[in-house]
């Protein structure tokens, strides 16, 4: 979420539903064996989201189709909104590493299977 927040312009917020993808098993093993909360993991590790492409809504289907055709798993991770018109539903991530950019609302629960 922090990386996404840094690339968004100030005044924008992306919503990211944690249930939108299945977290690879290794991250759940780290969480359970290390007794590490999900929020700590999501602040440190990518939890299976290796790259995010921010595209216009009308380009999302083409972008995911092209990625999949190239053998890269792809899905729509979230939607970008004007921050003033949006009510967060979870943990808001912003201002990371000193970047005054946008923000990300991370909500929902992770799927591990």
Q: What residues fall within each predicted segment?
A:
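Glycine-/charge-enriched secondary-structure boundary and capping motifs
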Residues: 1-113
């Amino acid at each position: 979420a922090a990386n996404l927040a840094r690339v968004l312009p100030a005044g924008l917020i992306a919503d990211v539903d944690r249930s939108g993808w299945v977290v690879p098993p290794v991250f759940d093993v780290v969480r359970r064996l290390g007794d590490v909360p999900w929020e700590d993991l999501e602040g440190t590790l990518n939890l299976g989201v290796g790259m995010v492409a921010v595209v216009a809504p009308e380009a999302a289907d083409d972008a995911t189709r092209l990625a999949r055709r190239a053998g890269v798993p792809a899905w729509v991770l979230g939607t970008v909104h004007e921050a003033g018109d949006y009510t967060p539903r979870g943990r808001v991530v912003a201002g990371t590493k000193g970047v005054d950019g946008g923000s990300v609302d991370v909500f929902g629960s992770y799927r591990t299977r």
